[in-house]
Structures are given as C-alpha cells and as structure tokens.
Amino acid sequence: MTAVLQANALEVTAGQRVSRCIGPPAHPYAWVFRPGRLNGTHFLTPAVLDMQVGVLERARGERVQAHTHVQQSRKLNSSSELLYVERGRVLVDIYDEDWQLLADELLSRGEMLLLLRGGHALTVIDDARVIEVRQGPYSGVDKCFRDGG
C-alpha cells in the first residue's frame, strides 16, 4: 500500500485500487474509490471513521464464516453517505462547512464516493443509476441547503 499526499488530498493505492481522500486525512470530508483488483478483504477507510468501506475480493467457492455483529452503542456527530454509481456518470461537488468548494469529482460506473462531512451537490452527466447508502434512522429534517433552497 502506498500513500501520496497532494494538495488537500491523500491518494492511497492498495493493489490496483486507488482511493483519494478529500480534506485532511485525520478529518476528511470525503473518500473517492476507483475500481481495481485486490486479493482478500481490505478496508479502504481508516478504522476511526464513522462509516467504513471495505472490499471483499474472493475466489469461487471461498466462504466467509457465519458470524454476527455485536450490538454496540455509538455516538455519531454527523450523517455519512456512500454513493455507488451502478451506471452512467455524475459530477459531485464537495464543499466544506462554509460552502467553499473543495473538489468536484466525476464518478463513472463502478466508482464510489463516501461523504463524511461538509456539503455536496450532484449533477447527472449521463443517464445514471446511483445507489445511496446512509446512516439511519432518517428523520427527513437533517439537511441544510445552500442558499436556503
């Protein structure tokens, strides 16, 4: 695994999968994940984040042992979102808490974006299907829109 620190972003390469951290690695705004091959199970995000992204690359016939996850109380300070582009292309603008644009990421089929803090906007470039995973429960009132819209 190699890491390259760039202006306001950290790129981590594990095998052929590249992830890019937007914002300071210790307190990121977002992680971008590009497709690639890995062997085994790899978590692409640091263990301290509120939401984890992992990849399981396994051969036919392999089995993950039956298991359960122990219930734990966790304190979360924000709601995280994962966007997975199943088809098409979307452009995601990523903002800090003061609505300053940090990055704009063009996502294509098979790519993911983990949004951890700050704001974001999405523009559909080509007809797309995007799967969104977020922490729940969702009350419907935990969004704050830029420009009051």
Annotate each predicted stretch with a short phrase.
Residues 72-73, 98-100, 129, 137-139:
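Short, surface-exposed beta-strand-loop junctions and turns on beta-sheet-rich folds
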Residues 55-77:
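Conserved short histidine dyad/triad with adjacent acidic residue
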Residues 96-117:
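Short acidic-glycine-tyrosine-enriched beta hairpin
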Residues 59-60, 78-95:
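Glycine- and acidic-residue-biased ligand/ion/polar-headgroup-sensing regions
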Residues 1-57:
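A short, N-terminal "cap"/entry segment at the start of jelly-roll beta-barrel domains
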Residues 66, 92-93, 113-115, 119-125, ...:
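Short beta-strand His + acidic residue motifs that chelate non-heme Fe in jelly-roll/DSBH
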Residues 8, 123-149:
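Double-stranded beta-helix
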